[in-house]
């Protein structure tokens, strides 16, 4: 099964459960932290069914995880992993090419409203979505960013238990203001 059906907070877990029950290998591009947390708990069931399950094979998560892993392998120690996107060049379209609501829109609204889960000070916890933080980027200075709910905050500490902090952010000059729902 190659699952690209979103939003994943609605469809991810039941499709994975059906794949395991059917004995089918499973790949997806899950980009929601809520099902990621539950999907990771199905590891032993997938192993018992002798199937391969790989979740989060998109750009983010996916490529972001690989980039984080490569960076971690180059360092002596890592206590914080922050993935994110630079939105400084984002401009709202004059007219949308979309004729209706799509999974990406629903995903974005879900992850920018309410609370989201991050890994902070060695434990998972809920924080307000779009909470402002400052990131000290070595050799570049301090950047302002906003927390955006995403699976990397769950998957990095799951696979690398020595990490103390993991989160996903959106940053960029004024671009984040486009996405703040007031």
Predicted regions: what is each one?
Residues 1, 25-26, 53:
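Hydrophobic beta-strand scaffold residues
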Residues 49-89:
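Adenosine-phosphate binding glycine-rich loop
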Residues 73-182:
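C-terminal catalytic/substrate-binding lobe primarily of soluble NAD(P)-dependent oxidoreductases
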Residues 12, 29-53:
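Rossmann-fold NAD(P)-binding glycine/threonine-rich loop
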Residues 18, 41-45, 50, 69-71, ...:
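Short low-complexity, flexible loop/linker segments enriched in glycine and/or proline
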Residues 3-4, 29, 56, 84:
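Structural motif
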Residues 7, 16-36:
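ADP-ribose/adenylate-binding Rossmann-like module
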Residues 1-12:
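Rossmann-like NAD(P)-binding element
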């Amino acid at each position: 099964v190659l699952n690209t059906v979103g939003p994943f907070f609605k469809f991810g877990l039941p499709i994975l459960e059906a794949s395991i029950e059917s004995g089918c290998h499973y790949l997806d591009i899950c980009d929601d932290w809520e099902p990621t947390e539950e999907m990771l708990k199905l590891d032993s069931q997938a192993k018992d069914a002798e199937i391969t399950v790989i979740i989060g094979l998109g750009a983010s998560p996916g490529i972001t995880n690989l980039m984080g892993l490569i960076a971690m392998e180059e360092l002596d120690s890592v206590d914080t992993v922050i993935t994110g996107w630079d939105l400084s060049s984002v401009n709202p379209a004059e007219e949308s090419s979309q004729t209706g609501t799509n999974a990406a829109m629903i995903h974005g609204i879900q992850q920018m409203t309410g609370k989201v889960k991050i890994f902070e000070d060695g434990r998972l916890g809920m924080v307000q979505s779009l909470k402002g933080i400052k990131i000290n980027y070595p050799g570049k200075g301090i950047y302002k960013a906003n927390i955006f709910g995403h699976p990397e905050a769950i998957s990095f500490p799951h696979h690398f238990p020595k990490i103390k902090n993991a989160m996903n952010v959106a940053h960029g000059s004024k671009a984040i203001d486009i996405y703040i729902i007031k």
